Amino acid sequence: MIDKRNKKAVTHISTCLCHSSIPIYGDSPFLNTHRAAMDPRPLVLLLLLASHISTFRQMYFEGETIHFPMGIYGNETTLYMNDIILEGTRANTTTRTISLTTTKKNAGTNLYTVISETGHNATYLITVQPLGQSIHHAYTWAGNTFTLQGQVFEHGNYTRWVRLENAEPKLIISWALSNRTINKGPAYTANMDFDPGNNTLTLHPVLITDAGIFQCVIDQQTNLTLTINFTVSENPPIVAHLDIHKTISRTIAICSCLLIAVIAVLCCLRQLNVNGRGNSEMI
């Protein structure tokens, strides 16, 4: 049996404990904080954030394969790929330059030799379209030299260089050739940017007509050398409109991730603030 003095002492100790900061089950600031941390809403938001980051990292920052039908039209310095579906895969590799020299041996012959300064083993197809017809000439690039059996170019003809890989046409570029005859003249140089991964080849001509067509002057009396320099990059840029699309999508993805993170942090801070206010009121 507890006498009055002991009962008063127990009551005093209980009152002090209840109004002190010593953790007691049910009123502990630690337990309240722990319950706030276990609030499922911030956890769900953080899991959603992790899912977003993982998904968009795989989509936009890793080795994705891009499938897109091309519908690019323009002058003769632009790719014509409206009937071809190209597939490109990003890869982080170095860029190398290959220099090609196409030489017309002499007037009256259709022998052309293409020389690579660096060498590149590949199979190419050149399509010559004289006066609306289509003639295909296939050859294999062995070592540093290969030979094309073609025909004399005439005004309005188009020469298409098609790179073949596993017997599938991967890229096409077109430019026009003029039938103007000169006694002698310099070699005309054009630059091409070639991306095997994205299967794009862009011609940057030196000589451009009013219509934006590259005119390669064919010398009927002397040899004509057309030097084509292009860079092979295996980390290809995406086509312009796809760049815009991916940029917008990537921006939306990043903004959504940031928004989810901010909401999760605010939920945690709000819960901690509520618990802190409740604990201060109790004290």
UniProtKB/Swiss-Prot annotation:
Residues 1-55 form the signal peptide. InterPro entries: Ig-like_dom (IPR007110), Ig-like_dom_sf (IPR036179), Ig-like_fold (IPR013783). It comes from the Viruses. Glycans are attached at residues 75, 92, 121, 157, 179, 198, 223, 229. The lineage of its organism: Viruses, Varidnaviria, Bamfordvirae, Preplasmiviricota, Tectiliviricetes. This is Putative Ig-like domain-containing protein ORF10. Residues 129-227 form the Ig-like domain. Keywords: Glycoprotein, Immunoglobulin domain, Signal. The keyword Glycoprotein applies. Disulfide bonds: none annotated. It comes from Fowl adenovirus A serotype 1 (strain CELO / Phelps) (FAdV-1).
